Amino acid sequence: VTFVMRPAPWGFDGRVWQDIKGREIPVDELTPGAALGARGMLERFARTYAAERGSFYRAAAAATRADGLPATLAAELDAAAERIEGDAAQDWVQGTILWRALTERVEA
């Protein structure tokens, strides 16, 4: 079963998933195994997003240097990449309501 994050009809609260067929499933109704899989998907999303964004910022910083633009701009782009790479992405995802709800369900 493939799950994607979707806002609940009453507003995003981080506790509702929508499956591939469009059915909305509250996190509380997922089996612990499905919640574990969903949590893994969320963690992979954070790592992938951080890697892609980090690469974008690093490439922009390199282009800035190559084009002779101010060094402060390149430094800001490098700093932006550092803020979202590696542990920062994992810390962010573990701070979300959805990750905590899935973890509670896994441990239930």
Label every model-predicted segment.
Residues 1-108:
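Alpha-helical propensity feature that highlights long, continuous alpha-helices across diverse contexts
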